[in-house]
Amino acid sequence: MSGRGKGGKGLGKGGAKRHRKVLRDNIQGITKPAIRRLARRGGVKRISGLIYEETRSVLKVFLENVIRDAVTYTEHARRKTVTAMDVVYALKRQGRTLYGFGG
């Protein structure tokens, strides 16, 4: 084993950094046209104006759950890098099997 020792910081519970960028309103990066394109791919013709914020909130909850599980797999393997397989296993755990990314 490499010299990791006991304890150590897990992902997601790191100590304070000197210059930490404050992350807020990043969900607004999912733009209205991006949501519209996803809906078009799903076969939607017309979209209500209220859909965009609702879609952002649902997507945020979904990604938080997947990322939490993926980071749990990463920490269990004592790695600091989340791999594609961590995400595949996290999705599989939630009943959304994804093919084409190894494993």
From Swiss-Prot:
Residues found modified as N6-methyllysine: 21
Residue numbers carrying N-acetylserine: 2
Domain of life, per lineage: Eukaryota
Cellular component terms per the entry's GO annotation: nucleosome; nucleus
Keyword Nucleus: yes
UniProt main location, coarse: nucleus
Residues recorded as bearing N6-acetyllysine in the entry: 17
Molecular-function GO terms, alphabetical: DNA binding; protein heterodimerization activity; structural constituent of chromatin
Region Disordered, residue ranges: 1-20
PROSITE patterns per the UniProt record, alphabetical: HISTONE_H4
Entry keywords, A to Z: Acetylation, Chromosome, DNA-binding, Methylation, Nucleosome core, Nucleus
Entry keyword DNA-binding: yes
Compositionally skewed regions (Gly residues) per UniProt: 1-14
Pfam (any one): CENP-T_C
SUPFAM superfamilies named among the record's database cross-references: Histone-fold (SSF47113)
InterPro entries in alphabetical order: CENP-T/H4_C, Histone-fold, Histone_H4, Histone_H4_CS
Residue ranges of the annotated DNA-binding region, renumbered to this chain: 17-21
Subcellular location: Nucleus; Chromosome
Family: Belongs to the histone H4 family.
Role this protein plays: Core component of nucleosome. Nucleosomes wrap and compact DNA into chromatin, limiting DNA accessibility to the cellular machineries which require DNA as a template. Histones thereby play a central role in transcription regulation, DNA repair, DNA replication and chromosomal stability. DNA accessibility is regulated via a complex set of post-translational modifications of histones, also called histone code, and nucleosome remodeling.
PANTHER family: HISTONE H4
Summary of subunit composition and partner proteins: The nucleosome is a histone octamer containing two molecules each of H2A, H2B, H3 and H4 assembled in one H3-H4 heterotetramer and two H2A-H2B heterodimers. The octamer wraps approximately 147 bp of DNA.
Stated name of the protein: Histone H4
Organism of derivation: Pyrenomonas salina
